[in-house]
């Protein structure tokens, strides 16, 4: 190939690479990334659909809805791995009112939901966590991981819409008082 041909082809190749990357950049700008499929359990389409769902929920409730799969929990239990992931990736202190991380851990063979902020303090009790996991459990057993995450997200929304559990409170250590949430029930 002559030098003149290489000079013409190099800029053309650079421009074509820019256009090839444009859809990816546009997709990333359309919302936050909430789906992290490290175990490769989801198709690209399933990841996109779940990410859209999580972004809609994040916008509606001002909370994070993080979906995580892993096949290497780095020697940690699923709860610790999920909590570390949530914190290390900036979800804990991003200005939202809390959130949840849903993990399918193929290393420990476990499904877990961990919550933070208002999601934990106000809406999602231990019993409700069990209900959320139960909502997706059969789908996980069947290998229908996207359906499992969707069911768990929907169960979470149902609990948020049900409101605060009657009798739920927090303790303010600074003033030594309990704050009981008015459920209106």
Show the residue positions of the predicted features.
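Bacterial N-terminal signal peptides that target proteins for export
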Residues: 1-12
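Transmembrane signal-anchor/signal-peptide helices with a preference for the extracytoplasmic
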Residues: 22-24
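Folded, non-transmembrane soluble domains that reside on the lumenal/extracytoplasmic side of membranes
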Residues: 2, 26-184
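Bacterial N-terminal signal peptides
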Residues: 10-20
């Amino acid at each position: 190939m002559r030098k003149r041909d290489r000079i013409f082809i190099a800029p053309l190749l650079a421009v074509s690479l820019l256009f090839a990357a444009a859809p990816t950049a546009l997709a990333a700008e359309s919302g936050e990334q909430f789906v992290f499929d490290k175990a490769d359990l989801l198709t690209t389409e399933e990841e996109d659909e779940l990410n859209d769902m999580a972004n809609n929920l994040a916008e509606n409730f001002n909370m994070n809805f993080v979906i995580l799969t892993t096949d290497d929990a780095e020697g940690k239990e699923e709860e610790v791995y999920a909590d570390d992931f949530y914190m290390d990736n900036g979800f804990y202190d991003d200005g939202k009112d809390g959130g949840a991380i849903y993990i399918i851990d193929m290393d420990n063979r476990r499904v877990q939901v961990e919550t933070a902020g208002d999601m934990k303090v106000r809406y999602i009790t231990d019993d409700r966590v069990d209900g959320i996991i139960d909502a997706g459990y059969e789908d996980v057993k069947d290998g229908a991981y996207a359906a499992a995450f969707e069911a768990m997200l929907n169960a979470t929304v149902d609990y948020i819409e049900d409101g605060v559990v009657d009798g739920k409170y927090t303790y303010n250590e600074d003033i030594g008082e309990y704050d009981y949430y008015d459920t209106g029930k």
